[in-house]
Amino acid sequence: MAEIKTLRAVQPRANRPQEFNGLYQIPTLDEVIALAKSQSRLSGRTIGIYPEIKHSTYHADLRNANGRRQFGRHYFENRLLAKLHAEYGNSECAPVFIQSFEVGNLQYLSKKTDINLVQLIDADDVNADGSISLVPPYKQPYDFVKAGDTRTFADLLTADGLDFVASYADAIGPWKPYLVKTVADNIDRNGDGAITINDRRVDGSTGVLELAHAKGLKVHTWTFRNDASGYGFADPQAEMTYYYDLGLDGLFTDFADTGVAARDASTNTGSNIEACGRHGRHNRQHR
């Protein structure tokens, strides 16, 4: 920890402001929670946190020079839960979502906590026709690869796949092009003389969002940026509003002011968002 605290954050994107480089340390989970709670008190509204568990399978297999496991299975999951339960309680109404691209760690957590769990979904890219590009090693959760499970991220977005996800998670977090179909048809729609991802034709919902809601899962997606807009959209606020209008429950953006404006401009009233604890695995438990 002392070594990590010698590091300072820098802005990796050259087109963004650089004046804060070197001013701030890498925050710990304790510090993030303390900040969220203090700002909740100051603002009079609840500010949550959204931690991601990274590379559970890799860390579980990691060994030292003597061949002994350095951490073992579920070391980080257990430590995270101990902290979150101490700070927020073991409650489905806690202002917390725990996310992961792996499956096994979320299945383990689902037996240990009522805090909301999110199955992240990513792969390689999207093809020209808007379908999910499934290229190894990115096409599967890493724990599936290690276990010899042939299912891909795309399989998790089918009706059967979402039923499976809803057995242990409360929400899905697919990359945004997996929710809205866009097609590369070589038309310069914004007239800038170049064909980019912004020029892709928007063909509406892929159906994943609606199917996930039908399975009782919330849907969050990522990442929206003013300076790097997305597939089929040149205007970042219009892009986010489009997703909200489809019924999206939440999104990640580097530009919160644009995200709030997009949400407020949406026709989505939030009626698709059920009461606390009535989605995913919790929805099944309450039936």
Walk through the language-model features, giving the residues of each.
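C-terminal active-site rim and adjoining tail of enzyme catalytic domains
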Residues: Y108, K112, N116-G280
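Metal-dependent phosphodiesterase/phospholipase catalytic core, i.e.
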Residues: M1-L156, D160-G161, S167-A169, P174-L179, ...
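Extracellular glycan-recognition regions
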Residues: H282-H286
